[in-house]
Amino acid sequence: MKWVLLVALVLFPCTAGHASTKLKASWRNPTYTGQRFKRILVIGMSKNLETRADFEVALAGKITRRGTTGIAGTDILLRPTAGPLDLTYIREQIRAFKIDAVVVSRLVKVETKTTYFPGQPYVLPYYNTFFGYYGTVFPVVYSPDYLMKDKTVRVETNVYSVKPPDGELVWTGTSDTFNPGSAHKVIRQLVNLIVKELEKQEILPESAE
């Protein structure tokens, strides 16, 4: 999209295991002087309405607790059932709610890696009696083969100033979530990561918690 916004999320496919979210790469606009934004709109780009709303509300709430007003897109944007929002409508809402920055996150890709682990031989202890040896047949047996599947969900998050005419990219980051479990847990981890990084980049004030 030509026009700039801030933070989007897509439904995370769920797999078993413990989710871990890490920042893969980030860039900050060198011309950004650290001016504080007052009202930040959070937009999650997902076809799943519930996941999108959960993400927007969670991030907006955490931004607000940092002393900056966070506004969830789900609270001010009436989205069509299919297709993107009209850019003129977005501009009107941004002006109406006096928003000066937007956070947008989008799903980049989902990768699933399957690793095959062949059976591994191990040596049995030596038995010097018939009963100890009987049933082992050979002094070497094999552990069973098995497969391990790892899923990685990559999300891009951009922060834009929306001052006229079209705004400016302030910060962009790419995060990887490994073996995501429930969407709720992934959202919580992603939100925490985003806020922590925005504090580090002096886009948000540091937490007093």
Regions found by a protein language model. Name each.
Residues A8, R106-K109, T177:
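Residues that line or immediately flank small-molecule/substrate-binding pockets and catalytic motifs
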